[in-house]
Amino acid sequence: MLFLKEEKIIDKENVIGSNIRRIRLEKGIGQTELIRDLQLRKIAITRETLVKIEGGRQHIKLDQLKAIKDI
């Protein structure tokens, strides 16, 4: 893992994205529900962004990762 100035985390092996998906599914939380909870916490994220993060096509921001951890 490597941190950039913009507080995005580079995850070349998509460990973070795949773990977010796995844990989300284990908890029975849908993407829409997770996005709603994050937006209520003032985290700027869309369902499209979550799909890209889980699929390894977009880097996650540090504030997004911290908020997901708390759900």
Report the location of each language-model feature.
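Helix-turn-helix DNA-binding elements, focusing on the entry/boundary residues of the two helices
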Residues: I20, Q31, R47, L62-L65
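Flexible coil/turn residues that form the inter-helical turn or adjacent wing/linker of helix-turn-helix
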Residues: I16, K27, I43, Q58-K61
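Short alpha-helical DNA-recognition segment
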Residues: G28-I53
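A short, Lys/Arg-rich alpha-helix, primarily the initiator
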Residues: L2-K27
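Heptad-repeat coiled-coil/leucine-zipper interface motif in alpha-helices
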Residues: I23, I53-G56
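DNA major-groove recognition helix of helix-turn-helix/homeodomain DNA-binding modules
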Residues: R57, K61-I71
